[in-house]
Amino acid sequence: MKVILREDFINLGKEGDIVDVKDGFARNYLLPKGFAVFSNKHNIDIFSQKKRAILKRQESRRKMAVELKEKLDKVNLEFIMQSNDSGKLFHSINSSNIADELLKLGFEIERRKIDMHHGALKAFGTYNVIIKLYEGISSVITVEIKREEKKNSLKKSKSVKKEV
C-alpha cells in the first residue's frame, strides 16, 4: 500500500515522501496514529502544494540537529547502580533511563531515537550509545555504569529484649 508520510519516520522516509508499506503496517499503525495518509490524487495534490514549506521545515530540523549534535557529543552520563555480591546489576539501563537522564540535563530526546545496539546495559562499564537526531546526523554519548559504594559498617541485627 502506498502512503504519504506526514512526518519524518526513522528507517521509512521523510515528511511528504510517498512510500510503499505493508497493508497491515499502514492500517494498524501509520494511518491511525496520524503518521501517514493514503496516497491518492487528492492527497498527492495537497502535498505537492506544501512541498516548499516541507523542504524549509526539513532544513530547519537539520540545522537544529547539527546544533544538538555538538552539545550532545560532550555529554557523559553516569549511573550509580546497586548489584549483588557477584557483581550482577539488580536492574539494567535501557533507552527510557537514558532519555530520562538526558531530560534532566535539558535534552528532550525521544527514546525511539536512542540506538541501544548492545541491547539493555546489564553490566558495569563504559558504553557508547548512538542517538539518531536526523537523517545522517547522529551523536555518540558515553554512558558509564558504576558500582554503588557499599557502606563499610555491617548491618547488625538489633534484637529487642522483652522484659518480663
UniProtKB/Swiss-Prot annotation:
The keyword Lipoprotein does not apply. Keywords: Ribonucleoprotein, Ribosomal protein, RNA-binding, rRNA-binding. GO terms for biological process: translation. It holds the Pfam family Ribosomal_L9_C. One of its GO terms (cellular component) is ribonucleoprotein complex. GO terms for molecular function: rRNA binding; structural constituent of ribosome. Gene3D superfamilies: Ribosomal protein L9, C-terminal domain, Ribosomal protein L9, N-terminal domain. InterPro entries: Ribosomal_bL9 (IPR000244), Ribosomal_bL9/RNase_H1_N (IPR009027), Ribosomal_bL9_bac/chp (IPR020594), Ribosomal_bL9_C (IPR020069), Ribosomal_bL9_C_sf (IPR036791), Ribosomal_bL9_N (IPR020070), Ribosomal_bL9_N_sf (IPR036935). It comes from the Bacteria. Belongs to the bacterial ribosomal protein bL9 family. Binds to the 23S rRNA. This is Large ribosomal subunit protein bL9.
